[in-house]
């Protein structure tokens, strides 16, 4: 479908508002799952690594399934997908209140809620991009803060609901709140299509009829013969021809000749259609090969390969604090009276601020977004290494704010990817990177939890997390150094026989 020119306003601002609240409602509980994590530890008595899988699946599976989610939005539209996904998120949260064990939560909270969030994310981004062109960056920045504000509010809300109604009541109420996604989704009116024919229809109109296996008006050979035979006999009976036997023989001869001709024509069409199917399959296979060739070309890019490792290591090491910070405070024996605000809420509000400030910095011409992203990775690695030394609420609150602000580097990640591979390859490269970002989100919290189960302390776990993020930052920094490009340019400009020529001349 061909959409008319994006209005950059009008109903588009309604789309921004409902997309903001959609991300607020769907991501609020999964991002603030650290509050629920403590209750699940007490309720089921499982290890921290096994319990952490619930939150990591809810936040990671949406990224892992992002290609499938994109196909669903492209096929059915943003509004139907948003409404359906609203039922998924609400149903998954409500089902989780009846969970008899941790494995049930893997399905209800981890997979169902996680997939619903992934579908909603793609729906909100797609419909926003359809309505905005010149102001697309501003619109996407506004809707992306919905998840961060949701993290800030839901952390305190879920804690209060648990104290009033228990864990099961909290999940039921949060699930009921998520039903408001249906109202938001119903307002995602698709952009009106233009009157001009779509490119797909224009292309298919030019294809000859013989290339369609089943033409609308085409009948089989047997049907054609039966129609001809019936029409010929009716005509002879109407004219009262006496020589029925002779005409019957003539009729059979005519029909046999028609039968042979139509069979030959049918065979030719079958051959043509078979060749067309072979060509179509060959073309699809060629597209598949081209995709993998382009993927290989992407990984030959030194900076892209480093960015691939950086985003994977960043999510393995940088995501666990938002899930485990509350348990870290409890393990440090910090009194609940000292809690002025949940640590997860601090992470959430600072993430929203970080997204806005880093996004503004990325728009300045004198700022290199790649080096800015590297700086956030190195600073986050240092902050993670400092967590084992924090023994008070104030220190953990400061570190939570720093980590939340630096996590806002998600807002500049598309800029970094574009700068690395170019706008032509952005979709392909960004899809690969998001898949492995989801893998890191899924693996990070369980790994940190297993470290705690092994050592009975979080110190080793966060030394590991800090090392992962620092390693990713240093790899990206080394790959992005301009000296590599200078060496490459110098070697490409040198003639192949320069060295032997100099030796011969000196001799």
From Swiss-Prot:
Protein's name in the database: Monocarboxylate transporter 9
Origin: domain of life: Eukaryota
Family membership: Belongs to the major facilitator superfamily. Monocarboxylate porter (TC 2.A.1.13) family.
Protein's cellular compartments: Cell membrane
Cytoplasmic domain ranges by topology: 34-52, 101-102, 158-163, 324-340, 391-395, 452-460
GO BP, one annotated term: creatine transmembrane transport
Gene: SLC16A9
Membrane topology: Multi-pass membrane protein
GO-annotated cellular components: plasma membrane
Any Pfam family hit: MFS_1
CDD domains documented for this protein: MFS_MCT9
Residue ranges crossing the lipid bilayer per the database entry: 13-33, 53-73, 80-100, 103-123, 137-157, 164-184, 303-323, 341-361, 370-390, 396-416, 431-451, 461-481
One Gene Ontology term of the molecular function aspect: carnitine transmembrane transporter activity
Function according to Swiss-Prot or TrEMBL: Extracellular pH-and Na(+)-sensitive low-affinity creatine transporter. Also functions as a pH-independent carnitine efflux transporter.
Alphabetical keyword list: Cell membrane, Membrane, Transmembrane, Transmembrane helix
Extracellular compartment residues: 1-12, 74-79, 124-136, 185-302, 362-369, 417-430, 482-507
Catalytic activity field: creatine(in) = creatine(out); (R)-carnitine(in) = (R)-carnitine(out)
InterPro entries linked to this entry: MCT9 (IPR030767), MFS (IPR011701), MFS_dom (IPR020846), MFS_trans_sf (IPR036259), Proton-linked_MCT (IPR050327)
Cited PROSITE patterns: MFS (PS50850)
């Amino acid at each position: 479908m061909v959409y008319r020119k994006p209005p950059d306003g009008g109903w588009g601002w309604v789309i921004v508002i409902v997309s903001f609240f959609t991300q607020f409602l769907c991501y609020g509980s999964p991002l603030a799952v650290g509050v629920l994590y403590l209750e699940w530890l007490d309720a089921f008595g499982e290890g921290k690594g096994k319990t952490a899988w619930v939150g990591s699946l809810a936040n990671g599976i949406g990224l892992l399934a992002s290609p499938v989610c994109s196909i669903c939005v492209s096929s059915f539209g943003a509004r139907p997908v948003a409404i359906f996904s609203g039922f998924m998120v609400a149903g998954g949260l409500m089902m989780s209140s009846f969970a008899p064990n941790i494995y049930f939560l893997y399905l209800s909270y981890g997979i169902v809620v996680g997939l619903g969030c992934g579908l909603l994310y793609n729906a909100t981004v797609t419909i926003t991009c359809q309505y905005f062109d010149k102001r697309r960056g501003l619109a996407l920045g506004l809707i992306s803060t919905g998840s961060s504000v949701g993290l800030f509010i839901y952390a305190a809300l879920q804690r209060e609901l648990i104290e009033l109604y228990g864990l099961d009541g909290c999940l039921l109420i949060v699930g009921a709140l998520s039903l408001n996604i249906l109202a938001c989704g119903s307002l995602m009116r698709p952009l009106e299509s233009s009157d001009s024919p779509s490119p797909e229809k224009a292309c298919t109109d030019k294809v000859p009829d013989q290339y369609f296996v089943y033409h609308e008006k085409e009948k089989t050979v047997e049907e054609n013969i039966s129609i001809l035979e019936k029409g010929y006999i009716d005509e002879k009976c109407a004219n009262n021809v006496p020589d029925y036997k002779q005409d019957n023989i003539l009729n059979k001869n005519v029909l046999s000749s028609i039968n042979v001709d139509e069979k030959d024509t049918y065979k030719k069409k079958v051959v043509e259609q078979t060749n067309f199917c072979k060509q179509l399959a060959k073309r699809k296979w060629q597209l598949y090969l081209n995709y993998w060739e382009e993927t290989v070309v992407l990984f030959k890019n030194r900076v892209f390969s480093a960015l691939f490792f950086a985003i994977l290591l960043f999510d393995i090491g940088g995501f666990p604090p938002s899930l485990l910070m509350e348990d870290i405070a409890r393990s440090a024996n910090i009194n609940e009276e000292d809690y002025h605000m949940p640590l997860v809420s601090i992470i959430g509000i600072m993430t929203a601020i970080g997204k806005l400030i880093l996004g503004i910095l990325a728009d300045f011409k004198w700022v290199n977004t790649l080096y800015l992203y590297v700086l956030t990775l190195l600073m986050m690695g240092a902050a993670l290494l400092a967590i084992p030394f924090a023994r008070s609420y104030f220190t953990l609150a400061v570190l939570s704010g720093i980590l939340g602000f630096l996590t806002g580097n998600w807002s500049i990640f598309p800029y970094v990817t574009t700068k690395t591979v170019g706008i032509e390859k952005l979709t392909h490269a960004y899809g690969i990177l998001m898949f492995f970002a989801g893998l890191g989100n899924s693996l990070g919290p369980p790994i940190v939890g297993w470290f705690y189960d092994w050592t009975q302390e979080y110190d080793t776990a966060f030394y590991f997390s800090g090392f992962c993020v620092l390693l990713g930052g240093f790899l990206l920094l080394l790959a992005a150094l301009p000296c590599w490009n200078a060496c490459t340019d110098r070697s490409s400009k040198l003639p192949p026989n320069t060295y032997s020529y100099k030796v011969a001349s000196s001799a």
